[in-house]
């Protein structure tokens, strides 16, 4: 099983400090610890850099590319930086993602069970009211019918930058 110490959570932010604070608190509350948090601050102007300097968060690495690369650009930048740090897997999320305390533990368990047979893993994304968010909700495809699939793990054909987990060897 992949050890959490070999995982880097990548969080991309731009001028959303209140959301970032909640995201970082949720990462600190994970039941599995020891992973690195790589924060990509896309040149925020809302006090994010000053706030980060005040944090005493073990495993936090902050990178600022000096410009707003956008979401996808920030994730590409973060993945390259995480690979340079030597991690074996990345856990990608926007700054408004609030992972449940057992989210990383569940992803690590799913990776141990299916890691060789899947390209990536993704968490279920819920709105604040508990309803499913459409960005990670799986749909029928011509390749697979998932009607009635009621399990903790669902075959997936798409995901968003809301709790996307993949091995760096991919």
Task: Annotate each language-model stretch with its function.
Residues 6-8, 36:
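Cell-envelope/extracellular polymer assembly enzymes that use nucleotide-activated donors
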Residues 25-34:
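Short, acidic, metal-binding catalytic loop of nucleotide-sugar glycosyltransferases
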Residues 26, 41-50:
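A conserved acidic beta->alpha catalytic loop
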Residues 35-43, 63-65:
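Short beta-strand/loop segment that forms part of the nucleotide-sugar
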Residues 53-73, 81, 85:
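Conserved donor nucleotide-binding strand/loop of the catalytic core
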Residues 87-96:
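Short beta-strand-to-loop acidic/aromatic patch adjacent to the donor-nucleotide binding site
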Residues 102-134:
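Conserved donor NDP-sugar-binding/catalytic core segment of glycosyltransferases
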Residues 146-166:
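A recurrent flexible, glycine/aromatic-enriched loop bordering the glycosyltransferase active site
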